Amino acid sequence: MGDQAAAATGITGIGTVGLPVSDHDRAIDFYVGTLGFEKRLDVEFAPGQRWVEVAPHGATTTVALAPAPPGSPIGVDTGVRFRTTSAGDDHARLKAAGVDVDPEVLHWPGVPPMFSLRDPDGNTLYLVESSA
């Protein structure tokens, strides 16, 4: 049944994940300046309305930095998990840069090392060490 559903929809992957932000420029400074992402798109599509996408270098999935709809929260647990080559090294770098990170990298049996961090709006993101 799963194969039939995939064939019926034409879905081929994840293109963009949206994160609620209160200030585009501050968010760009964090994601590009601190995390080292590249800015892929920054356009004004209506007066006072911007569409901004950032991504890790070489990634196919982007992150849309978008204002939260009225009444929707900012500072949420996004569930977004980024891959990293070294959770320990990135944890130390981000902590030294003043980023709100967990006190320690998690090391659970059978699970890749990981930790969470918060962006300037309080959105929780995760960095998970990849073996590939």
Name each region found by the language model.
Residues 30, 88-93:
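Short amphipathic alpha-helices within nucleic acid-binding modules
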